[in-house]
Design a protein with these regions (language model features):
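Nucleic-acid endonuclease domains
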Residues: 1-27, 35-46, 52-185
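Ligand/cofactor pocket segment of small-molecule handling proteins
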Residues: 31
């Protein structure tokens, strides 16, 4: 968070980042970034979900929960330009234990990172898990992700197909009605 704040505080930053803040406790993201649109007075926001994985644990980064199906689909219906970023931080832990106190002193070092726009994660790498409410989107392996350019509409169609394969078309219609995804005007 501090790194984003330092960049935003520099009015000359090359990213046009103007503001960074932490998400609230139950938000599906950890950080909100606001960028100025070049040569305009408008800005665009990006929600960032931070996923930390351990370098020395083989299963770390396998199928992390990203966000709920209904929540993310609703965001893209309301704003096709919505940006949801997954920031993957791979870390290594250095620690020592003090035998006299039993306390451990440790430091985490970020050894690599990857950044993905959720909308562009390939269909093969993004899975739907029906557990937990409306279901969770998961990345199969956060360290190896392919990117596919697509529109918000194509992204929603892919998510819907995954949901329907898992729960059926009747369940999708019920949810689409509840969240007002189907426009009747």
């Amino acid at each position: 968070m501090e790194q984003f704040e330092m960049i935003a505080d520099n009015a000359e930053n090359i990213y046009q980042l103007i503001h960074a803040e932490s998400g609230r406790r139950l938000d599906p993201f950890d950080i909100v970034l606001q960028f100025k649109i070049k040569n305009r007075t408008e800005y665009v926001s990006a929600d960032v979900d931070v996923k930390a994985t351990a370098e020395d644990i083989a299963s770390s980064g396998k199928s992390p929960n990203i966000t709920s199906y209904a929540r993310i689909r609703s965001e893209y219906v309301n704003d096709p330009d919505y940006i949801f970023i997954v920031l993957s931080l791979k870390h290594k832990v250095f620690s020592e234990r003090f035998p006299e106190t039993g306390m451990t002193n440790g430091v985490m070092e970020v050894v690599s990172y990857s950044v993905y726009d959720l909308k562009y994660i390939s269909e093969r790498d993004l899975s739907y898990n029906p557990a937990l409410g409306t279901g969770q989107l998961q990345i199969r392996d956060i360290h190896y992700v392919d990117i596919v350019n697509r529109t918000a509409w194509e992204f929603c169609q892919m998510l819907d197909a995954k949901f329907i394969r898992s729960r059926g078309e009747d369940a999708w219609l019920k949810m689409a009605t509840k969240y007002q995804w189907i426009k009747t005007d």
